Amino acid sequence: MEKIKQFFKELYIYQKEMYPIISRLILGMIVFAEIYFIVLINMGAGMSGMNITFPVDEMSLDGALWNGVKLFPLGIEELVCGFTIFSFLFWLRIADDFKDREIDKRLFSHRPLPSGRVTEKTLKIFISTLIAITLFLNLTFMPNFIFCVILYTYGSLMAVWFFQKHKIAKSLPLALITHNPVQLIMNIYIISFVVIKFKPFVNPFSIYSILAVFTLYFPALIWEVTRKIRAPKDETEYVTYSKLFGYRKSTTFAMVVTWIDIITNFILVWNLNKVSVAILAVLVSWMTWKFLEFKKEPTKFKLVDKVERYTYLQESTMILTVVVYLLVGKI
């Protein structure tokens, strides 16, 4: 009994400090919903109650039909898909702690794992159980189980440095190239579900499906780079992009990727809400100003703080675009 109490005590400590369950579960659902709906509504979908609707010309199509539309009820599949995003990101968080435990003992000794307040055994038992539950739910309810397997296979390779730790761990750019694509694979997992469930209404090779693959990928890339850009006086033994390439070049790279990202956003919302396009234009202009300001005076603020604020506002705009479209239609 005492061991069980200790187990849950350690889990509580870990989730509170490293991965708050409630907020991250909501985030997982939001990530799923943004990609799910942005693809569907660009393909002509609407909503009727708790059903996704597509207009049909031929009444011979399989599935429920009502007033000239085909109905696809929302249900357990959508919940499982959102939960999978939450679960997978939780696993990556723990896997990162395992991978970085030696350097964390020096640089982040206050964290739950390096401080000894949480043991590896507890986290291994928990994450093994969580992965098993997630795979079972996908096998039972999801039509795209193979894409779940691909996602978790890639995550497993990340956890062991793709069996090339001696090379990747010492190279920040190589780590970025091998690890950052996981966001693309996560997006493909969601989109594959949309394509399979709503066949033949969703074309996997449409411009909207392809661009949706990069939704949240570019923001994740920008954040990953900018959190490792520092002013020269703030550098430590921790390897950063600013230490490798200089803070000006690293900032320019992040700024270019930000503009590539916003162009994909413009295309995805152009036919849905012109007000959203204007808001996104204002946001990217502000972020560009902050990039240029940081290049001029890197000690004025932490660049990643501005990027996080921009990303929250950007993604909130994308989500509100979906909500407004579903409620009132095109603007």
Regions found by a protein language model. Name each.
Residues 1-331:
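Multi-pass alpha-helical membrane architecture of UbiA-family
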